[in-house]
Amino acid sequence: MNRKFFNNLICFVFSIILLTSCIKKKEEDKCLSYAKAPVTKIEGATTASVNQELNLTISFICFNGCGQFGNVEETISGNTTTIVVNAKYAGCICTQDVPTRTTLYKFKKSQAGTYELKFLQTENNYLTHTIIVQ
């Protein structure tokens, strides 16, 4: 009787392991990543009025066809803003091209002054756009 119970217990444990190992994981989480994207061009005005919103067109490179705009990280120090564009890579099978994508960056200041926007290209190398707010 003891041997039969032990065999049933082993079968039960292996059944649980087998069933839980077959649970499908979310496909979208498996092939999703983010990476810093080098900015190649900034287009937009260089002057603005106080509280005027400017739209700057930012061009950046993705490293394969799955790359799209992800988000922007800003670090503000005085009148200088350092901006990092992050590309979002969603998909397991991607073309091996190196596309240039664009996004809008909104700029608005409540005080007059000269503002420097530094967009990351490569580590410690920036593309700078200066805006004078009057």
What are these regions (language model features)?
Residues 11-12:
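Low-complexity, glycine/proline/serine-enriched flexible coil segments
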